[in-house]
């Protein structure tokens, strides 16, 4: 697996599996602790561990098409907080346009991990929350024309500062949702998962001491090398495909998602030139999820036990033109971005089908079906108490 001097391949495998087990344990904590069905039952959430440079080193076995979103967000975390981070801090974000988020219900909670006073890594979680405000229960209205109609935008902020919770931010979140008990409960499940990730990574770093980062770096190198080796086995060439989703509005025209997959040596370029401009509806897909769908597609068609870390993403280059449905710009609505995100995956499968027909997935239903409903029930003294729920049906 590794040919680097000073790196013991058995220890490398132990480190890799320890990291993966910790990321999976984080995922189980969320599943067991979450309040809302969309997290607890649908498992619409993700977990990851990152090294001190913010690179993903392990991912929980949760929602595959979302796992590749962490690198986009972590770049913003490093830019904003890498110098000022301190023990006990926890960050929160959901903004697609300010910090690499996806759509507003997907809230990220990130905890920097310190060992002996030094920043050594991060525990990262994302969960689809049942409601963050906006014009429709569940915060996903396909007829929304701009993001300001979809709910609360959370810029990258401190949810916990040096171990002290930001009560103002907790109250702000509770005041902008129809489901405060579910949202705050799921948020605390994410906090608990981050603490589990912190414990697991700390134990690993203390066990191996200064050599630990040698092995974390080597995992990235091995993943990149193995991905390049797999891509090099494929013949050079360009493969194109265009898929469509139904349009929206009174006189809808089909919305094309055009993809060109170019394999050159040990790299691949995925180009979305020709894809529809962004639309005045909530199906626009922020680029973070588009990247994740691309990584997921390529990761799925290659062979070999490639470490599930950020290194395998390096040979995969992506060009998604700004202002399109695969890279919208403010103020485009994006609540139903999964419709495009999953179709991006399908389009890549369509492009690669003639090349590796035995490895691509057959086309699914083309995207997730999300059902959200809500209303009000009478409480004491005729108080109007909101209720609601969100369910996601995905067969892909």
Name every feature range the model reports, one short phrase each.
Residues 1-87, 92-269, 273-396:
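Glycine/proline-enriched, intrinsically flexible loops and inter-domain linkers
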């Amino acid at each position: 697996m590794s040919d680097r001097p000073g790196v013991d391949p058995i220890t490398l495998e132990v480190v890799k599996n320890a990291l993966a087990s910790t990321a999976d344990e984080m995922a189980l904590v969320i599943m067991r602790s979450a309040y809302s069905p969309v997290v607890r039952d649908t498992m619409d959430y993700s977990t990851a561990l990152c090294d001190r440079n913010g690179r993903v080193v392990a991912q929980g076995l949760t929602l595959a098409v979302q796992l590749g979103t962490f690198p986009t967000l972590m770049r913003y975390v490093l830019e904003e907080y890498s110098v000022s981070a301190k023990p006990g801090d926890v960050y929160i974000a959901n903004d697609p346009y300010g910090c690499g988020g996806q759509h507003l219900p997907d809230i990220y909670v990130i905890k920097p991990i310190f060992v002996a006073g030094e920043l050594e890594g991060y525990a990262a979680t994302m969960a689809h929350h049942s409601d963050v405000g906006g014009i429709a229960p569940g915060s996903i209205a396909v007829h929304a024309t701009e993001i300001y109609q979809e709910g609360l935008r959370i810029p990258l902020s401190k949810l916990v500062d040096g171990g002290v919770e930001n009560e103002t931010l907790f109250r702000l979140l509770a005041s902008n949702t129809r489901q405060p008990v579910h949202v705050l409960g799921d948020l605390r499940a994410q906090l608990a998962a981050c603490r589990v990730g912190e414990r697991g990574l700390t134990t690993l770093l203390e066990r191996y001491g200064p050599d630990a980062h040698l092995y974390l770096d080597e995992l990235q190198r091995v993943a990149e090398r193995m991905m390049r080796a797999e891509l090099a086995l494929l013949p050079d060439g360009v493969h194109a495909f265009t898929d469509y989703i139904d349009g929206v509005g009174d006189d809808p025209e089909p919305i094309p998602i055009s993809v060109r997959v170019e394999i050159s040596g040990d790299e691949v370029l995925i180009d979305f030139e020709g894809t529809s401009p962004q639309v005045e509806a909530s199906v626009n897909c922020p680029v973070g999820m588009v990247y994740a769908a691309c990584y997921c597609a390529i990761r799925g068609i290659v062979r070999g036990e490639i470490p599930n870390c950020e290194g395998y993403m390096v040979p995969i280059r992506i060009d998604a033109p700004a202002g399109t449905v695969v890279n919208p710009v403010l103020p485009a609505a994006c609540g139903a971005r999964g419709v495009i995100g999953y179709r991006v995956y399908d389009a890549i499968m369509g492009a690669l089908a003639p090349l590796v027909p035995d490895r691509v997935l057959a086309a699914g239903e083309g995207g997730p079906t999300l059902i959200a409903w809500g209303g009000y029930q009478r409480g004491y003294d005729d108080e109007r108490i909101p209720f609601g729920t969100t369910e996601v049906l995905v067969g892909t």
